[in-house]
Amino acid sequence: MKSEQQYIDLYQQASQLIKTHSADVLNAVRDEAFADFKVQGFPTKKVERYKYTDMAALFAPDYGLNLKRLPIPVDPYETFTCDVPNLSTSVYFVVNDGFYTQALPQNKLPEGVIIDSLNRIAAERPDLVAPYYAGLAQTKDDAITALNTMLAQDGLFIYVPKQVKVDRTIQVINILRADVELMVNRRVLLVLEEGAELKLLFCDHAADNRRFLTTQVIEAYVGEGAQLELNCLEETHLKNTRVSNVYIDQQANSRVNHNVITLHNGITRNRLDLVFKGEGAECHCNGCVIADKSQHVDNNTLIDHRVPHCTSNELYKYVLDDNAVGAFAGRVLVRQEAQKTVSQETNQNLCATKTAHMFTQPMLEIYADDVKCAHGSTVGQLNNDALFYMQQRGISKREGKLLLQFAFVNEVIDKMELVPLRDRLHHLVEKRFRGELNKCEGCQLCK
């Protein structure tokens, strides 16, 4: 039986149960998503955007699903801290795919700002959710998005009204917890109206050493003159598989800073689709991957320049050890109307062993004639001359290797605008290279 058949059978048998526990706005697009998934099936490696990861194999195991929305016995405020020193944050939790409703007193938000369960707000305020939900994440274009749309029952909704600035960083801790091997389908909808500002940090953790499969779809609407900093930090374990699709819509003069940091995982597949729809917008998309053992990390990006006078910068760096596999495929599309585009795309990779593998494919597709665009990639090993130089000055070979690796990824971390988060990541990355960090050291469950 093909991998997709079990999900087709599941939806045919349980669609009414799924809809019973979901808001009408989410249900309105389920059947169409199901039809699209049936037509597409899981993409094979012959599909350009999925050539480096076998998606059918990821979804082949028989995972459990919490379709009845049974409560998960966990009090995240007692067990998870994920503290970032000197960073003022408002902390929220998503347990599997369910928003944890108990908020801390310090999570006071500016007037009009909403941070809540997507399913709850979709039921209570459909006027806020319906115009945006599944608008960017088109199910006809991607089978994983279609699968998530037909199965997702909850997640996170964030709304920031016009000209409102959220001063405190919003930290969302995604916790995976279950007594069985579990599939989680999480949905996130971010709406920033004109002139709004939001700094957001997602931290992914697994509280149980079980096998998890997570599909996640994030849709982010960034209005005219709005600013969004979206940071995603993954620290799970080798039994965890995560497939994440992020869709970002930028209007005129908006600014997005998107950072993806993968420190621990089993298999991670990240997709980013960002489109410029208004002039004067800019984005900075950065990725840092540290992988060893049998980890597999695949980042795939598309930056779509549809209008003139927009700027995009991408920098992704990988450090691969042992038998780890990394992949980066980045496509920058500059349409004919997008004159005066400025774009830079860079992928740099370090393979610490001969058994680590890196696949890299930066691409420029340009149809305008007045642009400044460049792209490039490198794959190399540690500089033996530099290692020898350090050994001559009393630095051990192991310590020299760690210093070179740390210096290599620092460029990505230093691009983060939140200084306390930047400092925290410097600390986590150093401990990761030293083999001293297996899980988030800020969580009580991980100690």
Report the location of each language-model feature.
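N-terminal amphipathic, basic helical "cap/leader" segment at the start of enzyme domains
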Residues: 1-146, 315, 321
